Amino acid sequence: KNDQQLRQIQLKPNYLLVDSPGCTYCIRRGLLNLSKKYWKSEYPHDALLWRMGLMSNGVYAYTDDLIRWRNHKKSAFAKESKKLKSVGAKKEWIRISSKFNDESMQKLIKHDIDGDTSYQQKVIDKNSNWLSKRMKFYKTGNLLRGVALLSSINCYPRLRQYLGDWYLICLKK
């Protein structure tokens, strides 16, 4: 909806989903400097900035067409969507996301976010639990572990990724 309004993006349980491509970001220098403490080479830098912004209640969207949609065959999004179609690649994404969630975001809210961070902690804990259960499903292929993931369905970046887990584990082998 392009009504030319500035709206705050709220932190949600599926905060690992990055809603906007990095080429559209406007970033405070302070956040960029702070990100240097938390960035690791395996983390996409735009995802780090998006997630740090969410944790600090500092992500806003201006609803207007500012750039034309660009679809690059070599973009991070295109590479990730092709790359994550195997069990091994998915396990690696879960491992990196777990490390990011449990280390970087945990440190961020403890040391660099002012005020009450109980909601942020709840989101991090919920994602930690979800990623752990998801990894166990991938490692064991146990169907009951897959069903147990329904309790964390709102952590999935997209609902179709839950179905994709089942496809990779049960059908694609």
Residue ranges and their predicted role:
Residues 3-5, 10, 69-73, 78-115:
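Catalytic core of nucleotide-sugar-dependent glycosyltransferases
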Residues 44-53, 84-86, 100-108, 121-143:
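Short flexible/disordered coil segments
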